Amino acid sequence: MKHSATSSEAHARATWPLPEPTLAYFPNARFVPSDRDLDAGAARPIRGGVAVVDDSPDFGHVPVLLERCVELLTPALTRRHPDGSGAVLLDATLGAGGHAERFLTDLPGLRLIALDRDPSALEIARERLARFADRITLVHTRYDGIAAALTESGYAATESVDGILFDLGVSSMQLDRPERGFAYAQDAPLDMRMDPGSPLTAADILNTYDEAELADILHRYGEERFARRIAAQIVRRRAKEPFTSTADLVSLLYQAIPAPARRTGGHPAKRTFQALRIAVNDELDTLRCALPAALDALAVDGRIVVLAYQSLEDRIVKRLFAQAVASRTPVDLPVELPGHEPRFRALTHGAGRADAAEIERNPRSAAVRLRALQRTQAPQATGKGD
């Protein structure tokens, strides 16, 4: 056991980048493989233990569950005309624009409203989608800004959109840039902001939040079983010197997490980094606000598809979608009251998963959970008492 402790301390002090097989572990990373994905095969070449960034001009990556998204959304987008004329698709998480590009290519009459909180992502997508410029509106906002984005784009905040897509998680563009601080396999500033203009950074949390707040963040957002131990060591360490880099934090985590736990379940930093990223970007509360606004924005017969990559997000989607498809008739009545029928119907049985063929072709899809709904009634059809 003494030898094991010595080895781990040496690893904590090792030169960077650390010899990890992935750029970062995030179960909800849209494009970079997590530890879960590695069993299905490497998604990117590895050099010197670090995933190699793809700088090719083809914008890099295959969108996850693309064909399934097309299958689910196209009926709503083509109900007026086969080429999508008159239809509006809202991409709430544009990223590099992979899903959007497919829909715009397939449906030459389709209009797209696309949101992203990261201005650099918007610029990359703008270049990628340049040939569709007359049919797209790009909006710099978080996805809980759906109502305002629709209004600013000339559409009503309710019942104006035919299709909505959420592809949750961290994009490759954010993970590929060490200076953004999302990845623990390279030393970088402790930033983790999806929008670089936001005020709060991971360093701010580590250096200013009290021990109880830190433990709560690590437990709630990272499901880290050693949250209290890690929080206590963070507070002790920062009293001597503030945290400034990902290497500072990874070194502490190697010391804080017991050796047996470090040997299983992937990199010991994975849960702490996930927790900090979620806290910095207010990801879960943003999703809780965004989904009801998205459902309100759907026209009758419109459809919404959500791709989630980790359980915390998927639980939120599952709960809100279950409420949306539930009858509003009191449970003790034997018949459905007129106007109290569900306003939505589920398009999937539970959560859709990537099949073996897609996982083999695109290992990034291994963790995804897909849920989809269709609006069946307008809100005003329910009467004043609702």
UniProtKB/Swiss-Prot annotation:
Broad class of the protein's primary localization: cytoplasm
User: Which InterPro entries does UniProt cross-reference here?
Assistant: RsmH, SAM-dep_MeTrfase_MraW_recog, SAM-dependent_MTases_sf
| EC number(s) given by UniProt | 2.1.1.199
Keywords of this protein's UniProt record, alphabetized? Cytoplasm, Methyltransferase, rRNA processing, S-adenosyl-L-methionine, Transferase
The reaction(s) catalysed by this protein are:
cytidine(1402) in 16S rRNA + S-adenosyl-L-methionine = N(4)-methylcytidine(1402) in 16S rRNA + S-adenosyl-L-homocysteine + H(+)
Q: Is the Transport keyword given for this protein?
A: no
Which superkingdom does the taxonomy of this entry point to? Bacteria
What is any one GO biological process for this UniProt entry? rRNA base methylation
GO molecular function terms noted in the UniProt entry: rRNA (cytosine-N4-)-methyltransferase activity
Binding residues for S-adenosyl-L-methionine, per the UniProt record? 97-99, 116, 143, 167, 174
Q: Where in or outside the cell is it found?
A: Cytoplasm
An example of a Gene Ontology cellular component annotation for this protein is: cytoplasm
Q: What class of enzyme is it?
A: transferase
Protein family (similarity comment): Belongs to the methyltransferase superfamily. RsmH family.
**Purpose:** Specifically methylates the N4 position of cytidine in position 1402 (C1402) of 16S rRNA.
Q: What is this protein called?
A: Ribosomal RNA small subunit methyltransferase H
Please tell me the species this chain comes from: Mycobacterium avium (strain 104)
User: Gene that codes for this?
Assistant: rsmH
